[in-house]
Amino acid sequence: MALATFKATSKLVKGLQVDTHVRNFTVRMDEPPSLGGTDTGMNPVEALLAALGSCQAIVAGAFAKSQGIDLQDFWLDVEGDLDPDGFLKGAPGVRMGFQEVRITPHIKTSSSAEDVAKFIKFVESRCPVGD
């Protein structure tokens, strides 16, 4: 299969508010007041966590049946730790991005614990956002 190209256009609107256009969708991003924004949308690092969780949830939904998993309910808690001083202050030696990302999957199924563990590994391995 040929490479697929995805495109997003992000425009600074006002202050720290950014509207990102993808296909027929617009997503507003902003920062919370504690980081200088007006809290009109999630911030980019929250969007990154949301994208990772959404990607894994989509993989789970797309492949559960073919992997023999009776998927009755599925969600993920995704958390990431970063030091804002990297972005806000340009502090030397402070990593800009996440120092750690934790994903906790929750699954309701009649499948065995062993099959669920294999399925979760499969989901993690097939998510392009987490690659």
What function would you assign to each model-found segment?
Residues 1-50, 61-131:
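Extended beta-strand/beta-hairpin segments
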